[in-house]
Amino acid sequence: MHGVVVVELKGYREWTESLGPRREHIIQQVQSRIQAAVWRSFTAVGALPHHFRYDFYIALVNGVSLDLVKRAVEKAARASPVGAGFCLGVGETPYEAYLRCGGGGGGAASPAVVAHMDVINSTEATRRNGPLDVYLKVVKLLGQLGERCKDLGCMAFYLGGDNIALFLPSPNAIYSILDGVDLRVRVGVGVAKRPYNAFVRATWALDRLRSAGREGVEVVK
């Protein structure tokens, strides 16, 4: 079983509106500070977080106790101008766990499976066409992956540059996810007891593919 936590910043929209129309520079700085705190506190306990809209955050928490999750949320909330709450979901896949957030259930004892994907030759494409062209292609790819993940039980997130992270239900799921993707990509897949360690292994696998100039998938367990 996989475990997913969704963190909500309570009253965040109301806080932003209270700042008046000349507010965006403040909001962007605060969001950056909160995101840094979320990454710091969740990875410290072995979880793997990401943002939703910046007033919601998600984390894969396989193998991470509820007490450690609470501690991570409390630490991250110190960077927020409003309070934070969270729900925990458990399911056969990360996406199912997300849909069941707040529904209770047992522990998430399955190994965490995480993918780190990049687009091949994006650096050369950026030199040729500028960064906007590659950015739009990656955003389109993210949308395609997000729709496929609804059926396959995964979740996809934009990391920046040409990089995408995926919470996977199993290592083999990546092959079904990539079926039909029209961009050339390389993907490292990591498997570990805790999600952040799985992501580290995925990144290590991706770096191996890059160094060898190969595309495709490499799995590290």
Curated annotation (Swiss-Prot):
The keyword Repeat does not apply. Its EC number is 3.5.4.29. It catalyses: GTP + 3 H2O = 2-amino-5-formylamino-6-(5-phospho-D-ribosylamino)pyrimidin-4(3H)-one + 2 phosphate + 2 H(+). It is an enzyme of class 3 (hydrolase). Catalyzes the formation of 2-amino-5-formylamino-6-ribofuranosylamino-4(3H)-pyrimidinone ribonucleotide monophosphate and inorganic phosphate from GTP. Also has an independent pyrophosphate phosphohydrolase activity. One of its GO terms (molecular function) is GTP cyclohydrolase IIa activity. Gene3D superfamilies: 3.30.70.270, Nucleotide cyclase. The keyword Hydrolase applies. This is GTP cyclohydrolase III. PANTHER family: GTP CYCLOHYDROLASE III (PTHR42202:SF1). Belongs to the archaeal-type GTP cyclohydrolase family. GO terms for biological process: biosynthetic process. Keywords: GTP-binding, Hydrolase, Nucleotide-binding. It comes from Pyrobaculum neutrophilum (strain DSM 2338 / JCM 9278 / NBRC 100436 / V24Sta) (Thermoproteus neutrophilus).
